[in-house]
Every structure is written in C-alpha cells, then in structure tokens.
Amino acid sequence: MNIENKEITSSWFTNLRDLLCKEFEKIEEEYAQTKGLKPAKFVRSSWQRNGGGGGVMSLMKGAVFEKVGVNISTVFGKISPEFRNEIPGAELDGKFFATGISLVAHLKSPLIPAMHFNTRYIETSKSWFGGGGDLTPFYPEKNETVKFHAAFKEVCDKYDSSYYPKFKKQCDEYFYLKHRKEPRGVGGIFYDYLNNGNFEQDFAFTQDVGKTLLSVYPEIVRSKLFLPWTAEQKEYQLIRRGRYVEFNLLYDRGTKFGLMTDGNVEAILMSLPPEVKFN
C-alpha cells in the first residue's frame, strides 16, 4: 500500500471538510442575522475504530440546515472473511485502507433540496477512487436541476468527455428505489472503482468534484433562503424523506461498507433525516 497516496488523500478530505463546514456556517449566519437568531455552529466528535483508524463527525442543527453532517474517516485493517468477496482485491487476506468524506444535508425549508455527496479513496490489493453528488428536491425546478448537472458536466468534461454521460447514468441507476420503481431525486454523478493507471489525474478529478459541490450547492441554498413555505409543503417534505431512509437502509453501498468494516454506527447513519413521516 502506498503511504504517500494515503496521506495526501486523507489530508484533502480533511481540508474539504473544513471548507464545507465554514461555508454552511456562513449561510446559517447570513440567515440568523436577518431573523435576530443566534447562528448555529458545527459540533465535532471523534471516534476510533477497534480494528484501526477512526474519524470525525461534524454535525450542525440550525435554522437553515435542519440537520447537516460532514464526516471524514480513515480506517484500515482486515475485513471479516464473510465480507471479503464483496470488496475488490480483499479476497485473499482481507487487508484494506479507506479514507473519505461524506456529506448529507437536510434543510428545514421544503423548497430547498436535500444534498448527498461523498468522495473516497480505497486500497486493498487494488486501489481506486469513488464518489459523487446528487440532489433531492421535494419540489423540483428544471432550471435548478439543469444548473446542478451543468456544473458536474463541466468538471467531468475537463478530464474525459465520456465521464459525464457514464457517471450520470450510473447515478440514475444507483439512486433508484427498485421496490417503489422511482428515482430518489434528480440525480447528479456517481462513480466507483475509478483507476485509470494515473493516480494524480484520478485524485485531481476527485478533488475537483468536491470543489464543484462546494460552489454549486451553497448557491442553490442561498437562492431560496428567504422563500416562504406552507405547513402542507413541510408535511410533503417529511413524507418524501421516507424515501431517503428506505434507500440508505436498503441499498446504500457506503452504509453497507461501513457496517462490514465495523465503522462508527452513528457516523454511518448520520445520513438519516432528523424527522420523517411514514403514512
């Protein structure tokens, strides 16, 4: 396993975490100032994994972000024998290293889309990058969806013109609730097992995906920050959040990987909404 690659990827995810938290706190502050409220701040808690490594959870519950979590983790060790065949390159000895960042934002306003983003670097006897970002609006708007996709298409095209159509398709297929026969949201990009034989290029792409999210999502949030909403719209948001819960518990690879590698359960389930209704 390449020690330098581990260090620079882990360092980047920590840096991106700091940038995201700072930007989201800034949005909370902008809103709080106009409403005479005390702005919310992220609360951090660290955890250690028994088999090796650990992570830091950053959680904020505010007036804009009902619940937003930004987690970073770097874990290593051996995967249990019963799960080794599910992780490429871990079949023989089970050794693995994984570092990454994950973000899930659930907004108080039903007019502002929920956001999911993660990027990661994993080593077994093989190595690869994965990640992506997807938007889940409760009241979709075409212009907003187009803008979101255009931002990720631009970063994809910078590296390979085949990336965006491929990663968009993978996102559409991945974030699909088979039992309901419906998509979770309006998509985005999703990639996994990315290894083109050029670590620097794959890493640069993964960094740019993070920078794109840092730019496009706060802009979407700010555009609807002060729009009024109704009790009926809030009720609909709570019901639709149930789809988020269903996907994360039934299909999400990150949830499964975290549980298979004895990760922190609270951090793994951070993606679940703070309030939800099932009718």
Curated annotation (Swiss-Prot):
Active site (record annotation): 116 (proton donor)
Pfam families: Coprogen_oxidas
Positions that bind a divalent metal cation: 106, 116, 149, 179
Site feature (Important for dimerization) residues: 179
Enzyme class: oxidoreductase
Record's subunit section: Homodimer.
Protein name: Oxygen-dependent coproporphyrinogen-III oxidase
Organism: Rickettsia rickettsii (strain Sheila Smith)
